[in-house]
Amino acid sequence: MLFRSELSYVKQMHKGDTISYGARYRAYEGEWLATLPIGYADGWRRDLGGQTLLVEGHRCPVRGVICMDQCMISLPKEFPIGTKVTLLGENNGEINNPSDMAVEIGTIGYEILCGISGRVPRNYVDNE
């Protein structure tokens, strides 16, 4: 299974700039932050905020609080808008496994998978 989104906004921040509900995250100088159009209304739970998402094989930490329709990540460098982001699955040799994520938040992997809402488009691929 592969659960992906894409970068919808990318910005280089200044020291002290804040993002997210309640200005929960304060950026460092020169940090690249990106917005993804996925949030808890899509089933990407708020308690998954401590996870890393995968961008071209880089583990990118979620910053701030997962919002209703979006979340933000820190990037190691600038990436273009539209760059694919892997929430669950494999990306350039790195893997985000729902069972591993579930252990960190005190649940099971199936709860993460079953929580993905109907707002998220699905593509079914026959690998045979």
Give, region by region, the residue ranges found by the protein language model.
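Active-site anion/phosphate-binding pocket segments in diverse small-molecule metabolic enzymes
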Residues: 1-128
